[in-house]
Amino acid sequence: MTKLRALRIGITIGLRSESESIWVNGIKQNALYLAKLFQHSPLGHSVMLVNTTTVALTDALPWDTKRFPARRFDDVKDALDVLIELGGQISDEQTRYLKARGTKLISYCCGPEYVQMIEAMIFRRVSGPVFINQQYDAIWVIPQVMETSAHFFSTLRRLPVREVPFVWDPMCLQASTRRLPFEGEYRPGGYANPRTGRRPKRLAVMEPNIDVLKFCLYPLLIAEQAFRIEGGDAIVHLHVTNADHLARHSPEFISIVKDLDIVRMGKASFVGRYDTPHFLSEHTDIVISHQWGLALNYFHFEVCWNGFAFIHNAHLCRELGYFYEGNDIETGVRQLLHAIRHHDNDWQGYRAKQRKAILRFLASNLGLISQYDELLADVCNP
Protein backbone atom coordinates (compact mmCIF):
# COMPACT_ATOMS: atom_id res chain seq x y z
CA MET A 1 0.00 0.00 0.00
CA THR A 2 1.16 3.53 -0.80
CA LYS A 3 2.15 5.25 2.44
CA LEU A 4 -0.82 7.10 3.89
CA ARG A 5 -0.88 9.58 6.76
CA ALA A 6 -3.71 10.28 9.19
CA LEU A 7 -6.45 12.15 7.36
CA ARG A 8 -9.21 14.57 8.30
CA ILE A 9 -12.24 12.85 6.82
CA GLY A 10 -15.77 14.20 6.44
CA ILE A 11 -18.75 12.00 5.57
CA THR A 12 -21.89 13.78 4.41
CA ILE A 13 -25.37 13.36 5.83
CA GLY A 14 -28.50 15.21 4.75
CA LEU A 15 -30.70 15.75 7.78
CA ARG A 16 -34.39 16.51 7.25
CA SER A 17 -35.23 17.12 10.93
CA GLU A 18 -33.31 17.76 14.14
CA SER A 19 -34.29 14.41 15.68
CA GLU A 20 -34.54 12.32 12.53
CA SER A 21 -34.54 8.59 13.31
CA ILE A 22 -31.68 6.48 12.03
CA TRP A 23 -34.32 3.92 11.01
CA VAL A 24 -35.95 6.16 8.37
CA ASN A 25 -33.55 4.61 5.86
CA GLY A 26 -30.08 3.10 5.88
CA ILE A 27 -28.18 6.22 4.81
CA LYS A 28 -27.36 7.67 8.22
CA GLN A 29 -26.50 4.20 9.50
CA ASN A 30 -24.16 3.82 6.53
CA ALA A 31 -22.42 7.08 7.42
CA LEU A 32 -22.03 6.01 11.06
CA TYR A 33 -20.63 2.59 10.19
CA LEU A 34 -18.15 4.07 7.72
CA ALA A 35 -17.11 6.66 10.30
CA LYS A 36 -16.56 3.92 12.87
CA LEU A 37 -14.43 1.96 10.41
CA PHE A 38 -12.16 4.94 9.73
CA GLN A 39 -11.93 5.66 13.47
CA HIS A 40 -10.58 2.12 13.94
CA SER A 41 -7.76 2.67 11.45
CA PRO A 42 -4.30 2.38 13.03
CA LEU A 43 -3.42 5.56 11.13
CA GLY A 44 -5.55 7.61 13.52
CA HIS A 45 -7.88 9.39 11.11
CA SER A 46 -10.05 12.23 12.40
CA VAL A 47 -13.63 11.65 11.25
CA MET A 48 -16.73 13.81 11.38
CA LEU A 49 -20.20 13.80 9.86
CA VAL A 50 -20.93 16.81 7.65
CA ASN A 51 -24.53 17.96 7.31
CA THR A 52 -25.36 19.40 3.89
CA THR A 53 -28.81 20.79 4.78
CA THR A 54 -29.87 23.80 6.86
CA VAL A 55 -31.32 21.63 9.66
CA ALA A 56 -29.81 22.61 13.00
CA LEU A 57 -27.43 20.21 14.71
CA THR A 58 -28.62 19.68 18.28
CA ASP A 59 -28.45 17.15 21.11
CA ALA A 60 -31.61 15.58 19.65
CA LEU A 61 -29.52 13.69 17.11
CA PRO A 62 -30.10 9.94 17.69
CA TRP A 63 -26.45 8.94 18.04
CA ASP A 64 -23.51 9.65 20.33
CA THR A 65 -22.34 13.03 19.02
CA LYS A 66 -19.18 12.93 21.10
CA ARG A 67 -18.14 9.72 19.40
CA PHE A 68 -19.52 10.74 16.00
CA PRO A 69 -19.45 14.55 15.87
CA ALA A 70 -21.59 16.32 13.28
CA ARG A 71 -20.81 19.73 11.79
CA ARG A 72 -22.21 22.12 9.19
CA PHE A 73 -20.41 22.14 5.85
CA ASP A 74 -19.45 25.80 6.17
CA ASP A 75 -17.88 25.16 9.58
CA VAL A 76 -15.50 22.44 8.35
CA LYS A 77 -14.89 23.22 4.69
CA ASP A 78 -11.36 24.42 5.48
CA ALA A 79 -10.52 21.54 7.81
CA LEU A 80 -10.88 18.46 5.58
CA ASP A 81 -8.43 16.40 3.58
CA VAL A 82 -11.17 14.16 2.19
CA LEU A 83 -14.93 14.61 1.88
CA ILE A 84 -16.94 11.46 1.21
CA GLU A 85 -20.28 12.43 -0.26
CA LEU A 86 -22.59 9.71 1.03
CA GLY A 87 -25.83 10.92 2.62
CA GLY A 88 -26.13 14.48 1.36
CA GLN A 89 -25.00 16.07 -1.89
CA ILE A 90 -22.90 19.22 -2.01
CA SER A 91 -23.48 21.94 -4.58
CA ASP A 92 -21.42 22.97 -7.59
CA GLU A 93 -20.19 26.01 -5.67
CA GLN A 94 -19.17 23.91 -2.66
CA THR A 95 -17.43 21.45 -4.97
CA ARG A 96 -15.40 24.23 -6.60
CA TYR A 97 -14.40 25.53 -3.17
CA LEU A 98 -13.10 22.15 -2.01
CA LYS A 99 -11.28 21.47 -5.27
CA ALA A 100 -9.58 24.87 -5.13
CA ARG A 101 -8.11 24.10 -1.72
CA GLY A 102 -7.03 20.57 -2.67
CA THR A 103 -9.60 18.55 -0.73
CA LYS A 104 -10.25 15.14 -2.27
CA LEU A 105 -13.91 14.49 -3.10
CA ILE A 106 -15.25 10.93 -3.15
CA SER A 107 -18.74 9.88 -4.23
CA TYR A 108 -19.87 6.94 -2.08
CA CYS A 109 -22.77 5.31 -3.92
CA CYS A 110 -24.94 3.17 -1.68
CA GLY A 111 -28.28 3.35 -3.48
CA PRO A 112 -29.64 1.89 -6.74
CA GLU A 113 -29.88 5.30 -8.35
CA TYR A 114 -30.40 4.02 -11.90
CA VAL A 115 -33.55 2.18 -10.83
CA GLN A 116 -34.75 5.09 -8.71
CA MET A 117 -34.21 7.52 -11.56
CA ILE A 118 -36.01 5.52 -14.24
CA GLU A 119 -38.92 4.88 -11.88
CA ALA A 120 -39.12 8.64 -11.26
CA MET A 121 -39.19 9.20 -15.01
CA ILE A 122 -41.73 6.48 -15.85
CA PHE A 123 -44.09 6.88 -12.89
CA ARG A 124 -43.64 10.66 -12.47
CA ARG A 125 -42.34 10.30 -8.95
CA VAL A 126 -41.11 13.60 -7.58
CA SER A 127 -37.33 13.72 -7.74
CA GLY A 128 -36.59 17.27 -8.77
CA PRO A 129 -33.71 18.62 -10.85
CA VAL A 130 -30.63 16.43 -10.77
CA PHE A 131 -27.15 17.88 -10.26
CA ILE A 132 -24.62 15.67 -12.07
CA ASN A 133 -21.31 16.37 -10.36
CA GLN A 134 -18.37 15.60 -12.65
CA GLN A 135 -15.61 16.77 -10.32
CA TYR A 136 -15.13 13.72 -8.10
CA ASP A 137 -11.68 12.27 -7.49
CA ALA A 138 -13.17 8.79 -7.06
CA ILE A 139 -16.50 6.99 -7.26
CA TRP A 140 -16.95 4.20 -4.74
CA VAL A 141 -19.85 1.80 -5.25
CA ILE A 142 -20.97 -0.92 -2.83
CA PRO A 143 -21.37 -4.45 -4.28
CA GLN A 144 -25.17 -4.68 -4.34
CA VAL A 145 -25.44 -1.50 -6.41
CA MET A 146 -22.84 -2.44 -9.01
CA GLU A 147 -25.12 -4.51 -11.25
CA THR A 148 -27.84 -1.92 -11.74
CA SER A 149 -26.03 1.40 -11.40
CA ALA A 150 -22.25 1.20 -11.91
CA HIS A 151 -22.28 2.21 -15.58
CA PHE A 152 -24.94 4.84 -14.88
CA PHE A 153 -22.57 6.49 -12.39
CA SER A 154 -19.43 6.18 -14.50
CA THR A 155 -21.00 7.50 -17.71
CA LEU A 156 -22.70 10.54 -16.19
CA ARG A 157 -19.82 11.42 -13.86
CA ARG A 158 -17.11 10.70 -16.46
CA LEU A 159 -14.98 8.59 -14.14
CA PRO A 160 -14.48 4.83 -13.68
CA VAL A 161 -16.16 3.41 -10.59
CA ARG A 162 -14.47 1.34 -7.90
CA GLU A 163 -16.33 -1.44 -6.11
CA VAL A 164 -15.84 -1.13 -2.34
CA PRO A 165 -16.78 -3.47 0.52
CA PHE A 166 -20.12 -3.23 2.29
CA VAL A 167 -19.80 -2.15 5.94
CA TRP A 168 -22.11 -2.86 8.89
CA ASP A 169 -21.99 -2.79 12.65
CA PRO A 170 -24.47 -4.00 15.30
CA MET A 171 -24.20 -0.79 17.35
CA CYS A 172 -27.48 0.77 16.11
CA LEU A 173 -29.29 -2.54 16.48
CA GLN A 174 -27.97 -3.03 20.00
CA ALA A 175 -28.89 0.51 21.03
CA SER A 176 -32.45 -0.10 19.83
CA THR A 177 -32.85 -3.52 21.49
CA ARG A 178 -31.22 -2.76 24.84
CA ARG A 179 -34.54 -2.66 26.72
CA LEU A 180 -36.30 -5.41 24.79
CA PRO A 181 -36.75 -8.94 26.17
CA PHE A 182 -33.51 -10.90 25.65
CA GLU A 183 -32.11 -7.68 24.11
CA GLY A 184 -34.11 -8.40 20.98
CA GLU A 185 -32.60 -11.83 20.33
CA TYR A 186 -34.74 -14.71 19.12
CA ARG A 187 -36.10 -17.19 21.61
CA PRO A 188 -38.45 -20.10 20.87
CA GLY A 189 -41.86 -19.16 22.22
CA GLY A 190 -45.51 -20.07 22.31
CA TYR A 191 -47.18 -23.34 23.17
CA ALA A 192 -46.34 -26.55 21.37
CA ASN A 193 -49.09 -28.16 19.33
CA PRO A 194 -50.01 -31.36 21.24
CA ARG A 195 -50.42 -33.28 17.99
CA THR A 196 -47.17 -32.27 16.28
CA GLY A 197 -45.08 -31.28 19.29
CA ARG A 198 -44.03 -28.11 17.44
CA ARG A 199 -44.71 -24.47 18.25
CA PRO A 200 -46.71 -22.63 15.55
CA LYS A 201 -44.64 -19.87 13.96
CA ARG A 202 -45.25 -16.19 13.42
CA LEU A 203 -44.11 -15.22 9.93
CA ALA A 204 -43.15 -11.71 8.83
CA VAL A 205 -42.51 -10.06 5.48
CA MET A 206 -40.90 -6.64 5.93
CA GLU A 207 -39.99 -5.36 2.46
CA PRO A 208 -40.26 -1.56 1.96
CA ASN A 209 -42.67 -1.97 -0.98
CA ILE A 210 -41.66 1.34 -2.57
CA ASP A 211 -40.03 -0.03 -5.73
CA VAL A 212 -39.54 -3.24 -7.70
CA LEU A 213 -36.30 -4.13 -5.93
CA LYS A 214 -37.73 -5.13 -2.55
CA PHE A 215 -41.40 -6.07 -2.73
CA CYS A 216 -43.59 -8.38 -0.67
CA LEU A 217 -45.36 -10.47 -3.33
CA TYR A 218 -42.93 -13.37 -3.75
CA PRO A 219 -42.52 -13.80 0.03
CA LEU A 220 -46.32 -13.83 0.26
CA LEU A 221 -46.45 -16.66 -2.27
CA ILE A 222 -43.83 -18.61 -0.32
CA ALA A 223 -45.87 -18.23 2.87
CA GLU A 224 -49.05 -19.23 1.03
CA GLN A 225 -47.60 -22.45 -0.34
CA ALA A 226 -46.17 -23.38 3.05
CA PHE A 227 -49.55 -22.67 4.65
CA ARG A 228 -51.28 -24.96 2.16
CA ILE A 229 -48.92 -27.75 3.21
CA GLU A 230 -48.76 -27.18 6.98
CA GLY A 231 -51.86 -25.12 7.76
CA GLY A 232 -52.59 -23.37 11.02
CA ASP A 233 -50.89 -26.08 13.04
CA ALA A 234 -47.54 -24.68 11.92
CA ILE A 235 -48.25 -21.05 11.01
CA VAL A 236 -50.13 -19.00 13.56
CA HIS A 237 -50.00 -15.70 11.63
CA LEU A 238 -48.31 -13.76 8.83
CA HIS A 239 -47.64 -10.04 9.15
CA VAL A 240 -46.78 -8.05 6.03
CA THR A 241 -45.43 -4.64 7.01
CA ASN A 242 -45.31 -1.51 4.83
CA ALA A 243 -48.34 -2.92 3.01
CA ASP A 244 -51.45 -1.27 4.45
CA HIS A 245 -51.59 1.15 1.51
CA LEU A 246 -51.49 -1.77 -0.91
CA ALA A 247 -54.23 -3.67 0.91
CA ARG A 248 -56.44 -0.56 0.95
CA HIS A 249 -55.77 1.18 -2.34
CA SER A 250 -54.24 -1.21 -4.90
CA PRO A 251 -56.90 -3.11 -6.88
CA GLU A 252 -54.22 -5.31 -8.45
CA PHE A 253 -52.73 -6.25 -5.09
CA ILE A 254 -56.14 -6.87 -3.53
CA SER A 255 -57.27 -9.06 -6.43
CA ILE A 256 -54.19 -11.27 -6.05
CA VAL A 257 -54.07 -11.69 -2.28
CA LYS A 258 -57.79 -12.00 -1.51
CA ASP A 259 -57.91 -15.58 -2.79
CA LEU A 260 -54.84 -16.79 -0.91
CA ASP A 261 -55.75 -19.40 1.71
CA ILE A 262 -53.67 -17.69 4.38
CA VAL A 263 -55.64 -14.48 3.80
CA ARG A 264 -59.10 -16.06 3.48
CA MET A 265 -58.62 -17.92 6.77
CA GLY A 266 -57.73 -14.72 8.61
CA LYS A 267 -54.10 -15.67 9.19
CA ALA A 268 -52.54 -12.65 7.45
CA SER A 269 -52.43 -8.95 8.31
CA PHE A 270 -51.23 -6.10 6.11
CA VAL A 271 -49.93 -3.37 8.38
CA GLY A 272 -47.96 -0.13 8.24
CA ARG A 273 -44.37 0.75 8.95
CA TYR A 274 -42.51 -0.56 12.00
CA ASP A 275 -38.90 -0.39 13.07
CA THR A 276 -37.23 -3.74 12.53
CA PRO A 277 -35.84 -4.60 15.99
CA HIS A 278 -39.10 -4.05 17.89
CA PHE A 279 -41.27 -5.80 15.32
CA LEU A 280 -38.99 -8.83 15.27
CA SER A 281 -38.96 -9.03 19.06
CA GLU A 282 -42.72 -8.64 19.50
CA HIS A 283 -44.29 -10.32 16.48
CA THR A 284 -41.85 -12.57 14.63
CA ASP A 285 -40.23 -16.00 14.55
CA ILE A 286 -39.38 -16.30 10.85
CA VAL A 287 -38.76 -13.62 8.21
CA ILE A 288 -39.34 -14.24 4.50
CA SER A 289 -37.59 -11.91 2.06
CA HIS A 290 -37.09 -11.36 -1.66
CA GLN A 291 -34.94 -8.88 -3.54
CA TRP A 292 -34.30 -8.19 -7.21
CA GLY A 293 -30.98 -6.46 -7.83
CA LEU A 294 -30.11 -5.47 -4.25
CA ALA A 295 -28.50 -8.53 -2.71
CA LEU A 296 -26.99 -6.97 0.43
CA ASN A 297 -28.98 -5.04 2.98
CA TYR A 298 -28.68 -3.99 6.61
CA PHE A 299 -32.07 -5.61 7.20
CA HIS A 300 -30.57 -9.02 6.38
CA PHE A 301 -27.91 -8.56 9.03
CA GLU A 302 -30.31 -7.22 11.66
CA VAL A 303 -32.54 -10.28 11.31
CA CYS A 304 -29.72 -12.82 11.32
CA TRP A 305 -27.51 -11.20 13.98
CA ASN A 306 -30.27 -11.69 16.54
CA GLY A 307 -30.94 -15.26 15.49
CA PHE A 308 -34.24 -15.05 13.64
CA ALA A 309 -34.79 -17.58 10.87
CA PHE A 310 -34.36 -15.76 7.56
CA ILE A 311 -35.64 -17.12 4.23
CA HIS A 312 -34.04 -15.08 1.43
CA ASN A 313 -32.56 -14.95 -2.07
CA ALA A 314 -29.73 -12.45 -1.46
CA HIS A 315 -26.86 -14.20 -3.24
CA LEU A 316 -24.17 -11.80 -1.97
CA CYS A 317 -24.76 -13.19 1.53
CA ARG A 318 -26.03 -16.66 0.66
CA GLU A 319 -24.28 -18.09 3.72
CA LEU A 320 -26.81 -16.34 5.95
CA GLY A 321 -30.13 -17.83 6.99
CA TYR A 322 -31.97 -20.19 4.66
CA PHE A 323 -31.13 -19.31 1.05
CA TYR A 324 -33.07 -19.87 -2.17
CA GLU A 325 -31.86 -18.86 -5.63
CA GLY A 326 -33.46 -16.05 -7.64
CA ASN A 327 -37.21 -16.51 -8.00
CA ASP A 328 -37.16 -20.21 -7.14
CA ILE A 329 -40.24 -20.19 -4.95
CA GLU A 330 -40.30 -23.97 -4.59
CA THR A 331 -36.90 -23.91 -2.89
CA GLY A 332 -38.05 -20.95 -0.83
CA VAL A 333 -41.02 -22.99 0.38
CA ARG A 334 -38.78 -25.94 1.25
CA GLN A 335 -36.47 -23.64 3.20
CA LEU A 336 -39.42 -22.12 5.06
CA LEU A 337 -40.78 -25.56 5.95
CA HIS A 338 -37.34 -26.62 7.14
CA ALA A 339 -37.12 -23.54 9.37
CA ILE A 340 -40.61 -24.14 10.75
CA ARG A 341 -39.79 -27.74 11.59
CA HIS A 342 -36.16 -27.58 12.66
CA HIS A 343 -34.95 -24.04 13.44
CA ASP A 344 -35.67 -24.33 17.15
CA ASN A 345 -33.62 -27.51 17.43
CA ASP A 346 -30.41 -25.46 17.39
CA TRP A 347 -31.42 -21.82 17.58
CA GLN A 348 -28.34 -20.89 19.60
CA GLY A 349 -25.97 -22.58 17.17
CA TYR A 350 -27.77 -20.85 14.30
CA ARG A 351 -27.26 -17.41 15.89
CA ALA A 352 -23.57 -18.10 16.47
CA LYS A 353 -23.20 -19.19 12.84
CA GLN A 354 -24.90 -16.01 11.60
CA ARG A 355 -22.65 -13.74 13.61
CA LYS A 356 -19.56 -15.54 12.41
CA ALA A 357 -20.68 -15.10 8.79
CA ILE A 358 -21.32 -11.38 9.33
CA LEU A 359 -17.86 -10.73 10.82
CA ARG A 360 -16.36 -9.96 7.41
CA PHE A 361 -18.70 -6.96 7.04
CA LEU A 362 -18.08 -5.39 10.46
CA ALA A 363 -16.62 -1.89 10.83
CA SER A 364 -14.14 -3.33 13.34
CA ASN A 365 -12.84 -5.99 10.93
CA LEU A 366 -9.10 -5.38 10.50
CA GLY A 367 -9.06 -6.64 6.93
CA LEU A 368 -11.90 -4.30 5.99
CA ILE A 369 -10.18 -1.36 7.66
CA SER A 370 -7.00 -2.11 5.71
CA GLN A 371 -8.94 -2.28 2.43
CA TYR A 372 -10.45 1.14 3.02
CA ASP A 373 -7.09 2.65 3.95
CA GLU A 374 -5.77 1.32 0.64
CA LEU A 375 -8.71 2.89 -1.16
CA LEU A 376 -7.96 6.22 0.52
CA ALA A 377 -4.29 5.92 -0.42
CA ASP A 378 -5.21 5.40 -4.07
CA VAL A 379 -7.20 8.64 -3.99
CA CYS A 380 -4.82 10.77 -1.93
CA ASN A 381 -1.57 9.46 -3.41
CA PRO A 382 -2.42 8.62 -7.04
Predicted regions and their residues:
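N-terminal subdomain of nucleotide-sugar transferases
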Residues: M1-N51, A223-D233
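Extended catalytic core of nucleotide-activated donor transferases of GT-like folds
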Residues: L15-S17, A31-A150, V271-D275
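Catalytic binding pocket for nucleotide-activated donors in carbohydrate/polymer assembly enzymes
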Residues: E282-L362
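C-terminal alpha-helical cap of glycosyltransferases
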Residues: L359-P382
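Donor nucleotide-activated moiety binding/catalytic core segment of transferases
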Residues: D244-N306
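Conserved catalytic-core segment of nucleotide-activated headgroup transferases in glycan assembly
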Residues: W23, I27-N30, T148-H151, R158-K267
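A short, charged/proline- and glycine-enriched loop
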Residues: T2-L15, D78-A79, P194-L203
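Short, flexible/disordered intra-domain loops and linkers
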Residues: S17-I27, Q116-F123, R248-P251, L320-E325
